[in-house]
């Protein structure tokens, strides 16, 4: 059934297809229909960050930037849903076209640029949703906020989403916001993490609950850089790391249509690179910080490979575009088989 829907959607431009898909999934969620469209995955309860997940397979940030289809995605069987990236103020993102399919490689290139309707709009959508499961909210900085003031944007978003999120992801790894990835390293990372940690403590007192903080990192790092990031996360007492965002590499898509477009590459070509980062992180963290793995999961076994590499949870995005809701069940089944 999804193969037919995909064939029709792929006749549209990628961004039009994306918007239509969100509308349809959102409408199906409001009507309670999405659960009828696919066989539900097996129950596989998983505890991470002090949270209880129905299963360890989640929706990665970026598909539902504004929280328009939270109930719809949950009904498809995801064990958790992450929305965003959201910024303090609405922003249009980069000029179109900015989203490209590379179907021969089961890949996507995007240079969206954190297009979103702002954190206040997203919170209205969160409040309207009926979903009671684990909800992650991914936060970023506005395009026109200088990098040296990026901390202010993250704290603004954290203040606003804290009471409504199960966990909050801090996106310092999108390649489509100039200067953003510099926040992953050195004093910039240390200062950001310390500010977030202090604010988390204040908000815990204010709201009477501790909301975990996860940091989302890029795949384009050496083992030494990854080790330094791991050390910084441990030093700041972060709650999780999400590995990884999209890559600037074009390995695996050379010569394909759109391969030379600027932006981050996701899907199958980033799989090995992302899994390697997970392995390095796992070795450095030694179980002291959970890893949420994302990048290139297009078959169930790819999810199991990431768990075997050291992840506690996985997320999918591009694989969902190419394989549809059945991939969720396949990933849950593969992880369940690994645990036996």
UniProtKB/Swiss-Prot annotation:
Bilayer topology annotation: Peripheral membrane protein
Cofactors demanded by this protein: FMN
Catalysed reaction, written as an equation: (S)-dihydroorotate + a quinone = orotate + a quinol
Pathway: Pyrimidine metabolism; UMP biosynthesis via de novo pathway; orotate from (S)-dihydroorotate (quinone route): step 1/1
Localization annotation: Cell membrane
A GO term from the CC aspect: cytoplasm
Cofactor note as given: Binds 1 FMN per subunit.
Top-level taxon: Bacteria
Main location: membrane
EC supergroup of this enzyme: oxidoreductase
InterPro entries in the cross-refs: Aldolase_TIM (IPR013785), DHO_dehydrogenase (IPR050074), Dihydroorotate_DH_1_2 (IPR012135), Dihydroorotate_DH_2 (IPR005719), Dihydroorotate_DH_cat (IPR005720), Dihydroorotate_DH_CS (IPR001295)
Enzyme Commission code(s) on record: 1.3.5.2
BP-aspect Gene Ontology terms: 'de novo' pyrimidine nucleobase biosynthetic process; 'de novo' UMP biosynthetic process
Chain positions recorded as FMN binding sites: 61-65, 85, 138, 171, 216, 244, 267, 296, 317-318
SUPFAM superfamilies, alphabetized: FMN-linked oxidoreductases (SSF51395)
Binding site for substrate: 65, 110-114, 171, 176, 245-246
GO molecular function, one term: dihydroorotate dehydrogenase (quinone) activity
Pfam (any one): DHO_dh
Keywords, comma-separated and alphabetical: Cell membrane, Flavoprotein, FMN, Membrane, Oxidoreductase, Pyrimidine biosynthesis
Active site: 174
CDD domains: DHOD_2_like
Oligomer status and interactors: Monomer.
Protein family according to the UniProt entry: Belongs to the dihydroorotate dehydrogenase family. Type 2 subfamily.
Function: Catalyzes the conversion of dihydroorotate to orotate with quinone as electron acceptor.
Protein name, entry field: Dihydroorotate dehydrogenase (quinone)
Protein source organism: Ectopseudomonas mendocina (strain ymp)
Gene name in the database record: pyrD
């Amino acid at each position: 059934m999804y193969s037919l829907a995909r064939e029709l959607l792929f006749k549209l431009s990628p961004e039009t297809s994306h918007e239509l898909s969100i509308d349809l999934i959102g409408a199906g969620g409001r009507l309670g229909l999405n659960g009828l469209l696919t066989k539900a995955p097996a129950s596989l309860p998983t505890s991470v960050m002090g949270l209880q997940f129905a299963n360890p397979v989640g929706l990665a940030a970026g598909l539902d930037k504004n929280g328009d289809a939270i109930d719809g995605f949950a009904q498809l069987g995801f064990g958790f849903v992450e929305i965003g990236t959201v910024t303090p103020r609405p922003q249009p993102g980069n000029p179109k076209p900015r989203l490209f399919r590379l179907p021969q490689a089961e890949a996507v290139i995007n240079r969206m640029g954190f297009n979103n309707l702002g954190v206040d709009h997203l919170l209205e959508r969160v409040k309207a949703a009926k979903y009671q499961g684990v909800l992650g909210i991914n936060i970023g900085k506005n395009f026109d906020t200088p990098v040296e003031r990026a901390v202010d944007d993250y704290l603004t978003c954290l203040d606003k989403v804290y009471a409504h999120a199960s966990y909050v992801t801090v996106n310092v790894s999108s390649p489509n916001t100039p200067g953003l990835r510099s926040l992953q390293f050195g004093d910039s990372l240390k200062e950001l993490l310390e500010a977030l940690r202090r604010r988390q403590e204040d908000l815990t007192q204010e709201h009477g609950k501790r909301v975990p903080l996860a940091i989302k990192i890029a795949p384009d790092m050496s083992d030494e850089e990854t080790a330094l990031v791991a050390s910084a996360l441990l030093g700041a007492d972060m709650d999780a790391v999400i590995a990884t965002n999209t890559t600037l590499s074009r390995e695996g898509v050379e010569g394909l249509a759109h391969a030379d477009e600027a932006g981050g590459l996701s899907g199958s070509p980033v799989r090995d690179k992302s899994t390697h980062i997970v392995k390095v992180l796992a070795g450095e963290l030694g179980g002291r910080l959970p890893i949420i793995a994302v990048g290139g999961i297009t078959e169930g076994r790819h999810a199991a490979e990431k768990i075997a590499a050291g992840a506690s949870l996985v997320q999918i995005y591009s694989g969902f575009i190419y394989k549809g809701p059945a991939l969720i069940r396949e990933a849950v089944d593969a992880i369940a088989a690994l645990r036996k």
